C-alpha cells in the first residue's frame, strides 16, 4: 500500500485559489468527474505527479500550459517484459535464493551513454558526468534548444527526486504544450488563470 510519510497530500498555498472560476483540483485528490478532453489545462509544478499527468493528457487537451519553478531530472523507464525465469521463481514461492541469483545475473547492464555508478552519489565529478549525459539526451529529445535549456536542471542528479517516466521531455515538442518557467513560481491565481 502507499501508506507512510508521503501519503498525506501537501496542498499548495497559492493566493487567490478560491477566486478561480474554472475547474481545479490537486492530483492527490483527482476529480474523475472532470473531462479534460478539448480543454485548456494548466499544471503547476513539474514533480512526479505533475509529470505523469503532463505525459498522460497532452494528446487529449486543447492546450496544456506547464508552470515550472525548477526543472526536473527524468529518465525513461526502459521497461521490458519480466523474464520467464523470474516469473517461474515467483510461482515457486516468492523471493527465493534462486530469484536473487536470477536478479543479479540478469540485472540491468551498464549503459555507456548513461554513466550511472554509485560514485555519482558522492563524487561531484562522476555526478557532473552523469548530468552532462542526461542534458545531452534532453537536447536530443527537445526540438527547441531554448526550451531544452529550460527543461535541464541546474542542480546535481539525486539532489531532488529523479523521475523515471517515458516521453516526458518529448511531450514538450507537441504544438499544444507550452512551458512557463519562472524561478519564483506561481504567485497567485486570478478568476481566469494564474500569475
Which residue stretches match the model-derived regions?
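Short, surface-exposed acidic
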Residues: 140-153
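Rossmann-like dinucleotide-binding core of oxidoreductases
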Residues: 2-136, 140
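Anion-binding catalytic surfaces of enzymes that hydrolyze or transfer phosphate/sulfate esters
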Residues: 148, 165, 180
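Generic recognition of flexible, low-complexity loop/linker segments
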Residues: 53-54, 167-168, 191-193
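Short polybasic linear motifs
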Residues: 86-89, 169, 178
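A conserved short coil-to-beta-strand element within the FAD-binding core of flavoproteins
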Residues: 30-33, 154-156, 176-195
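Short beta-strand to alpha-helix junction loop
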Residues: 121-130, 156-167
Amino acid at each position: 500500500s502507499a501508506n507512510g510519510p508521503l501519503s498525506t497530500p501537501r496542498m499548495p498555498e497559492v493566493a487567490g485559489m478560491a477566486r478561480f472560476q474554472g475547474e481545479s483540483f490537486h492530483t492527490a485528490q483527482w476529480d474523475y468527474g472532470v473531462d479534460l478532453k478539448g480543454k485548456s489545462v494548466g499544471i503547476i509544478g513539474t514533480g512526479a505527479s505533475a509529470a505523469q499527468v503532463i505525459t498522460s493528457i497532452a494528446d487529449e487537451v486543447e492546450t496544456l500550459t506547464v508552470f515550472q519553478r525548477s526543472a526536473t531530472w527524468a529518465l525513461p523507464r526502459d521497461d521490458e517484459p519480466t523474464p520467464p525465469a523470474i516469473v517461474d521463481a515467483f510461482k515457486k514461492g516468492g523471493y527465493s535464493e534462486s530469484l536473487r541469483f536470477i536478479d543479479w545475473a540478469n540485472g540491468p547492464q551498464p549503459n555507456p551513454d548513461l554513466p550511472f555508478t554509485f560514485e555519482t552519489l558522492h563524487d561531484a565529478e562522476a555526478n557532473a558526468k552523469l548530468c552532462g549525459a542526461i542534458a545531452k539526451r534532453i537536447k536530443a529529445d527537445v526540438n527547441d534548444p531554448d526550451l531544452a535549456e529550460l527543461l535541464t536542471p541546474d542542480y546535481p542528479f539525486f539532489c531532488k527526486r529523479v523521475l523515471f517516466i517515458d516521453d516526458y521531455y518529448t511531450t514538450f515538442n507537441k504544438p499544444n504544450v507550452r512551458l512557463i518557467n519562472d524561478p519564483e513560481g506561481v504567485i497567485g491565481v486570478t478568476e481566469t488563470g494564474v500569475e
